[in-house]
Amino acid sequence: MKEIDLVIDTEEIAEFFYRELARRGYIPSEDELFEIADITFDYLIEKCMIDEELDEDE
């Protein structure tokens, strides 16, 4: 299987969830969105779908 580089960050996940939840009639707070995004990111790592790489700037 070929390996590809894919960059996903929690802000991108939060924006996606906001759009999808708003479309379904839910308006979550910013804190709720980032919690959902963080949980989703952790889930993807746990399932070995992505690897976490720390920014060199941090």
UniProtKB/Swiss-Prot annotation:
This is Uncharacterized protein YozD. It comes from Bacillus subtilis (strain 168). It comes from the Bacteria. The gene is yozD.
